UniProtKB/Swiss-Prot annotation:
GO biological process, one term: photosynthesis
Gene: psaI
Protein name: Photosystem I reaction center subunit VIII
Protein's cellular compartments: Plastid, Chloroplast thylakoid membrane
The family this protein is said to belong to: Belongs to the PsaI family.
Transmembrane segments: 10-30
Highest taxon in the source lineage: Eukaryota
Organism, scientific name: Picea abies (Norway spruce)
Gene Ontology cellular component terms for the protein in this record: chloroplast thylakoid membrane; photosystem I
Main location: plastid
Function in brief: May help in the organization of the PsaL subunit.
Lineage: Eukaryota, Viridiplantae, Streptophyta, Embryophyta, Tracheophyta
Keyword terms, alphabetized: Chloroplast, Membrane, Photosynthesis, Photosystem I, Plastid, Thylakoid, Transmembrane, Transmembrane helix
InterPro entries: PSI_PsaI, PSI_PsaI_sf
Membrane topology: Single-pass membrane protein
């Protein structure tokens, strides 16, 4: 019962979390480039 429910919860979580992590890494890269 857990296996079919897991992707239903995991896919939207990754869909929201992945762009957030990408934005954070991009912001840190811009900030680091600005310091240099």
């Amino acid at each position: 019962m857990i296996i079919p429910n897991l992707p239903s919860f995991f896919v939207p979580l990754v869909g929201l979390l992945l762009p957030a992590i990408t934005m954070v890494i991009f912001h840190l890269y811009i900030q680091n480039d600005d310091i240099f």
